Amino acid sequence: MTPTHFSLNAAFMLGLAGLTFHRVHLLSALLCLEGMMLSLFISMALWTLKTESMSLSTAPMLLLAFSACEASAGLALLVATARTHGSDHMKNLNLLQC
């Protein structure tokens, strides 16, 4: 395993571990998701450069566009939750309590 692969895998695993263990605030969960998506974007971009495939060159940009959509939807949810409930705790997002 090359150092580049190791660092990208470690970044993804740290984001996943942060998402599973530190799920108290919505903002921290969104930051962990963004870290995971960024490591996936970099690994896909490096993979398309390594294989020199023109048919796969749009996949990293598509992933980045979906990541931006996910971030904007997450921030909108964060603002709506903070306005209605007064905090960004993940326990407020339980729909069974409504």
Swiss-Prot record:
GO terms for molecular function: NADH dehydrogenase (ubiquinone) activity. The chain crosses the membrane at residues 1-21, 26-46, 59-79. InterPro entries: NADH_UbQ_OxRdtase_chain4L/K (IPR001133), NUOK/Mnh_C1-like (IPR039428). Keywords: Electron transport, Membrane, Mitochondrion, Mitochondrion inner membrane, NAD, Respiratory chain, Translocase, Transmembrane, Transmembrane helix, Transport, Ubiquinone. Its EC number is 7.1.1.2. One of its GO terms (cellular component) is mitochondrial inner membrane. It is found in: Mitochondrion inner membrane. It catalyses: a ubiquinone + NADH + 5 H(+)(in) = a ubiquinol + NAD(+) + 4 H(+)(out). Its main location: mitochondrion. It comes from the Eukaryota. GO terms for biological process: ATP synthesis coupled electron transport. It is an enzyme of class 7 (translocase). It holds the Pfam family Oxidored_q2. It is a multi-pass membrane protein. Belongs to the complex I subunit 4L family. Core subunit of the mitochondrial membrane respiratory chain NADH dehydrogenase (Complex I) which catalyzes electron transfer from NADH through the respiratory chain, using ubiquinone as an electron acceptor. Part of the enzyme membrane arm which is embedded in the lipid bilayer and involved in proton translocation. Core subunit of respiratory chain NADH dehydrogenase (Complex I) which is composed of 45 different subunits. This is NADH-ubiquinone oxidoreductase chain 4L. It comes from Danio rerio. The gene is mt-nd4l.
